[in-house]
Regions:
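Transmembrane-helix boundary motif in ABC transporter permease subunits
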Residues: 1-8, 72-104, 117, 121-124, ...
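C-terminal transmembrane helix and the adjacent membrane-cytosol boundary/short C-terminal tail
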Residues: 2-14, 24, 153-168, 174-183, ...
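Short membrane-interfacial helix/loop motifs at transmembrane-helix boundaries
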Residues: 24-58, 209-214, 265
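Short hydrophobic faces within alpha-helices
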Residues: 64, 89, 106, 162-170, ...
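Membrane-cytosol interface at the C-terminal ends of specific transmembrane alpha-helices
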Residues: 133-169, 176-182, 192-197, 205
Length: 265
């Protein structure tokens, strides 16, 4: 009993240390975003000045605008493509389905730098295609589609195939069957995939760095360029806001997943 007690204490300490290692830098960053001092090691009082300066910086506002536009377009298009791909994969035989899923896995586990360089090489084949908004959005779509597939496909696999057959037996067209039977059932997966795509696009730096053009900057690229001149308190404020947005999106995904699980039972 004593050994079990010590073992539990040690395991709890280990877990606490792991979480401190993961989240302590983030906590320090958030605290420093409200610090009057320009130097993180000294606390000189609470302030919102860095946030006020952040929103007065036109270059940051422009980067925010670019990021939101790219993330919105990429997530919507990737969700549409990923949903259709999921339906196609789900209708395949097990052999071909396994091949397609493995191909999707490869694109997910590939290092971002490999994807970024390969996309840059691919875009360079087309002389009419200049690096800019189009290439950036295409790159983000490529990044996000596999995640949508793996968000939607489980919902399709849970779907009772007899429902579609019954609807068509009762006179429903394939289009009506999709919109009235299939779509409502897989909607939680579609929404989760879209939110995940938006988050991935919002957070991406490496792929954006390789596929964006001159004069176009996303928030992640802007943060990188700002750090070259030293760690400004505005960077702390900007990354804190980005972190807040990502946390909110992940909470929404978790709530929707929990509701979906409750509805199943």
């Amino acid at each position: 009993m004593v050994k079990k007690g010590y073992s539990k204490i040690i395991s709890n300490i280990y877990i606490v240390l792991i979480f401190l290692f993961l989240y302590l830098p983030i906590i320090v960053l958030v605290i420093n975003s409200f610090n009057k001092s320009k130097f993180g090691g000294v606390w000189n009082g609470f302030t919102l000045d860095w946030y006020m300066q952040l929103f007065k910086d036109k270059s940051i506002i422009l980067s925010l605008y670019n990021t939101i536009i790219v993330a919105t377009l990429a997530s919507v298009i990737a969700t549409s493509i990923g949903t259709l791909a999921s339906i196609g994969i789900n209708s395949m035989t097990s052999r071909y389905k396994s091949v397609m899923l493995n191909l999707s896995y490869i694109s997910m586990i590939n290092p971002d730098i490999v994807i970024g360089v390969s996309l840059l090489s691919f875009f360079s084949l087309f002389q009419f295609l200049k690096l800019g908004y189009v290439t950036l959005i295409l790159a983000h779509i490529t990044l996000c589609v596999p995640y949508v597939v793996f968000a939607v496909l489980p919902k399709l696999q849970q779907l009772n195939p007899n429902l579609s057959e019954a609807a068509q037996d009762l006179g429903a067209t394939p289009t009506q069957t999709f919109f009235k039977i299939i779509l409502p059932e897989i909607k939680p997966g579609i929404i989760s995939g879209m939110i995940m795509s938006f988050t991935l696009s919002l957070d991406d730096f490496i792929i954006s760095f390789f596929t964006t053009g001159a004069g176009i900057s996303t928030l992640s690229i802007k943060v990188y360029s700002m750090t070259k001149r030293g760690v400004s308190p505005k960077i702390n404020a900007l990354t804190t806001l980005m972190l807040l947005v990502i946390i909110i999106l992940m909470i929404i995904i978790q709530i929707r997943s929990s509701k979906s699980e409750k509805n199943r039972y």
